[in-house]
């Protein structure tokens, strides 16, 4: 029987543990701009997927996701040990890391909304002085 509430609680705790460990315990400078955004645990509590994003060194800089991915792959064993020490479960889930695409998708969605708003404004400006075709009130006797 799968306990989804327990899996959700464990995922939340794994997210907190991994984020804290990357910030305070893992001494890899390649992980400096990595942010843990979410974690998901399978129903059998044996596998956990940790989602992360990578920032650039500056606002305009492109993030180096390949370097961050390599650093996370190297630190996976150490992170699993830290998670196992802090979780009180019989079996420590295996950790896998996946780049979180939600920020890029939301930025694209925001761009689409801005484009639609601009088109609405252009249409509103175009129709401001427009008059209906035909009679003003076609139902007038």
UniProtKB/Swiss-Prot annotation:
**SUPFAM superfamilies given in the database record:** Ribosome-binding factor A, RbfA (SSF89919)
Q: Which GO terms describe its biological process?
A: maturation of SSU-rRNA
GO-annotated molecular function: ribosomal small subunit binding
Q: Which residues form the signal peptide?
A: none
Query: What are the record's GO terms for cellular component?
Result: cytosol
InterPro entries the record matches: KH_dom-like_a/b, RbfA, RbfA_dom_sf, Ribosome-bd_factorA_CS
- The organism sits in which domain of life? Bacteria
Which compartment or compartments is the protein found in?
Cytoplasm
**Residue numbers spanned by region Disordered:** 120-141
Q: Name one Pfam family in it.
A: RBFA
Q: Which UniProt keywords apply?
A: Cytoplasm, Ribosome biogenesis
Describe the subunit structure.
Monomer. Binds 30S ribosomal subunits, but not 50S ribosomal subunits or 70S ribosomes.
This chain's function reads: One of several proteins that assist in the late maturation steps of the functional core of the 30S ribosomal subunit. Associates with free 30S ribosomal subunits (but not with 30S subunits that are part of 70S ribosomes or polysomes). Required for efficient processing of 16S rRNA. May interact with the 5'-terminal helix region of 16S rRNA.
Q: Which family does it belong to?
A: Belongs to the RbfA family.
Known HAMAP family for this protein? RbfA (MF_00003)
User: What protein does this entry describe?
Assistant: Ribosome-binding factor A
Gene designation = rbfA
